Amino acid sequence: MDLTLVLSLLFLSCFHGVSSDSRYFTSLFTLGDSYIDVGNFVIMAARAVPAVPVWHDKLPYGMTFFGHPTGRLSDGRVIVDFIAEQFGLPLLQASLLNSSDVSKGANFAVGGATAIDVDFYERNNLVQFKLLNNSLSVQLGWLEELKPSFCNATKGCRGCFSKALFFVGEFGVNDYNFLWSAGKTEEEVMSYVPKIVEHIVRPWRGLSTKVQYMWLCQGIHQTGARQPF
């Protein structure tokens, strides 16, 4: 089992028995890639010009829990659904649905999301196709845009995130995928590691000193033994 999934489950076990009126978390915000995307990729792909092919908008995706496709790259739920259920929160909708009710949080994750902005890969000819603009910085921008609506829904900005849990899914795996697919050697890929890590870490440095809330950050899984590599 993926170590990051194990750690996430251990985190949930610490709050076993917490009721829906818990003092712990009253909202959940998630950023990440396909592991926790609940429909943003499908929405972005449909809006893209030309449209981006989508394969997970039909069965068997969604069949084991929802009974129909939901935009999740899973036949059922994803890890953030279980986290929401643990705290008595509703399953988050994709943020790009622009729901009028954001009082319980939002899911900003998009399949294929990168740590480094996508124009870096396009500008340096590291990909042969147009990428969706879904990087970590873009998702953080969406979060910033949503903040006034969330704070209004929770009666004021001062401390409005104090009972929010932020789940940051894996970032970086798609960056490495693009580099390997571009024919980069192991040494060349390794040379990009500091840049990728810096893009993942940098946004949180300022936030952690300005706002009080809890972050749960997921690392990337080992890729060396996976079939594409």
PLM features: residue spans?
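Conserved active-site regions of diverse hydrolases
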Residues: D2-F229
